[in-house]
């Protein structure tokens, strides 16, 4: 087949494709010596844009739709036709999977200086290497300590998902360039609970400091009229409140997430599956990444883990509460860890199930084991907590596949090295981790369309969400996975006009757009930071 026929076939193949332009990829085309001019002439005639020419290497770079490659391979003079692969700067910075999943890496935050997110949580470690360059102010509730310190680490993790700085360290957030304004209200100390009245006071503080979006990775099962009316008032003032749906893995409503004027956020994993701990209610509105979320924690409070067998490195996650340290020894199969195994001076390999992670580690420790590796009994990473149990050996979790591979190496005369070290970053699970993804996306979209109201942004997020699970809205994922670029495209196309009818019917009477206060008093109820049930997981 000659060049003319090949190009004619190619042009016919793509002429009916509406997605041909969007589907283009960059390829390296190397041709026979002396045939460069002929190949280039026909490519230009066919409408191709040649990106670069390497005359000394008899090659050029072109961008073509993927479906055209097979046709181009038939050109007689072509010796190499391969994709022009990307290369990256090698840095220690990681982009958490959630950033790309919600399309934050597809949208510029160059207009974010006009937006403010208020985070109500356990504080913000201002000295953190990935957070210190942000534009941030803060307040503290009585008795909770300084807002710029975080004894718990929860609030710092949330803040990192929203605004970790793009500085070649650690991670990046949804708005990573230090332009977004943050206001921190610290209502929790290291104990991780406060009252509903504290939350209302924190919300008032957010309003007083001009917040556009309020992020709350917290909640409790008892509703409060006083609290409900405060969020209705905030919504009427143009503020968008976002809260975690809850980590009970059931259908109970959690508050403030289940108030009509608050966006309730469910958690999904990297594969867009619903997290088994995520609440499923008729108030769930949007979903976001909440499983194995890597973000900032108080400096040195995180844990990094590594396991090597000879020169082979394996991915591992330090168990929450694990001691720091490095251990080496042989590898011993200890089953489920329910019965003694001969582990003196060695590392225990234990399967997840039946008893707690702490009990497995204690059994290993009692038999003289120097460290423990617990492998998952289902697909995926294993993130676990040892709780308050005093375990004195390093403990890590690995996937089911890594566990199976390690079992296959038990007979090898090799030394296993396991290390748990201090880190400024950590993997957390929970709807607490999903919530800042939605709050951050809301702020990012709003910064690109400041003419929209909070209701307009809310409806755009709903309309543009990626539908997951059942067709349409469902109790597990709401309208679906929040998407920044899709929401902006939706507004670009349709504007941000608000529909008259909202999906959620208001359960309480309103006057003039503000909540009518029907009651003069309400019980002050406790609420808490949201942690998943992994700390007590037995199987």
What residues fall within each predicted segment?
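Protease zymogen maturation seam
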Residues: 24, 38-57, 70-116, 124-130, ...
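Sec/Tat signal peptide C-region and signal peptidase I cleavage site
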Residues: 18-22
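Bacterial N-terminal signal peptides
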Residues: 9-15
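Subtilisin-like serine protease catalytic core
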Residues: 105-137, 146-197, 258-261, 271-273, ...
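C-terminal subdomain of the subtilisin-like protease fold in secreted/lumenal serine endopeptidases
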Residues: 50-53, 172-175, 184, 197-219, ...
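Extracellular S/T/G-rich loop segment that most often corresponds to the catalytic His/Ser-adjacent loop
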Residues: 116, 121, 129, 239, ...
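Acidic glycine-/aspartate-rich tracts in secreted/extracellular proteins
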Residues: 34-36, 86-87, 122-126, 166-168, ...
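N-terminal domain-start motif of subtilase-like serine proteases
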Residues: 52, 63-69, 90-119, 139-153, ...
């Amino acid at each position: 087949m000659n060049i003319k026929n090949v190009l004619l076939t190619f042009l016919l193949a793509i002429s009916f494709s509406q997605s041909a332009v969007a589907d283009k990829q960059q390829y390296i085309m190397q041709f026979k010596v002396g045939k460069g001019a002929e190949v280039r002439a026909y490519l230009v005639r066919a409408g191709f844009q040649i990106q670069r020419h390497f005359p000394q290497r008899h090659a050029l770079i072109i961008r073509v739709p993927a479906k055209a490659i097979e046709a181009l391979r038939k050109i007689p003079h072509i010796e190499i036709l391969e994709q022009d692969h990307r290369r990256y700067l090698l840095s220690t910075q990681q982009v958490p999977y959630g950033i790309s999943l919600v399309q934050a890496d597809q949208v510029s935050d160059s207009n974010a200086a006009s937006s403010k997110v208020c985070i109500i949580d356990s504080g913000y470690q201002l000295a953190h290497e990935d957070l210190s360059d942000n534009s941030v102010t803060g307040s503290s509730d009585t008795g909770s300590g300084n807002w710029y310190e975080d004894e718990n680490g929860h609030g710092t993790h949330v803040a990192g998902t929203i605004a970790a700085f793009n500085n070649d360290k650690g991670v990046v957030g949804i708005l990573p360039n230090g332009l977004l304004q943050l206001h921190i209200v610290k209502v929790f100390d290291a104990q991780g609970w406060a009252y509903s009245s504290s939350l209302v006071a924190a919300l008032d503080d957010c309003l007083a400091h001009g917040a556009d979006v309020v992020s709350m990775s917290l909640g409790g099962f008892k509703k409060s009229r006083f609290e409900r009316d405060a969020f209705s008032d905030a919504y009427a003032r143009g503020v968008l409140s976002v809260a975690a749906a809850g980590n009970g893995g059931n259908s109970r409503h959690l508050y403030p997430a289940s108030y009509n004027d608050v966006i309730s956020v469910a958690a999904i994993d990297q594969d867009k599956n619903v997290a088994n701990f995520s609440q499923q209610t008729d108030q769930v509105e949007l979903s976001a990444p909440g499983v194995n979320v890597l973000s900032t924690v108080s400096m040195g409070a995180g844990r990094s883990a590594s396991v090597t067998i000879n020169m082979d490195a394996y991915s591992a996650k330090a168990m929450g509460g694990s001691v720091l340290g490095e251990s080496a020894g042989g590898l011993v199969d200890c089953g489920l860890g329910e019965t003694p195994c001969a582990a003196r001076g060695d590392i225990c390999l234990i399967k997840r199930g039946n008893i707690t992670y702490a009990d497995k580690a204690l059994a290993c420790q009692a038999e003289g084991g120097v460290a423990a590796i617990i492998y998952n009994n289902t697909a995926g990473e294993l993130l676990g907590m040892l709780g308050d149990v005093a375990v004195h050996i390093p403990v890590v979790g690995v996937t089911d596949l890594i566990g199976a591979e390690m079992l296959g190496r038990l007979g090898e005369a090799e030394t296993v090295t396991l290390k748990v070290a201090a880190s400024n970053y950590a993997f957390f699970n929970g709807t607490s981790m999903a919530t800042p993804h939605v709050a951050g996306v809301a702020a990012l979209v709003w910064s690109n369309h400041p003419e929209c109201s909070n209701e307009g942004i809310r409806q755009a997020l709903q309309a543009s969400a990626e539908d997951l699970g059942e067709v349409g809205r469902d109790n597990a994922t709401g309208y679906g996975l929040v998407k920044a670029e899709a929401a902006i495209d939706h507004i670009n196309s349709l504007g941000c006009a608000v529909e008259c009818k909202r999906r959620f019917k208001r359960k309480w009477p309103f006057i003039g757009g503000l909540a009518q206060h029907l009651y003069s008093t309400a019980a002050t109820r406790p609420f808490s930071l949201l942690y998943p049930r992994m700390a007590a997981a037995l199987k």
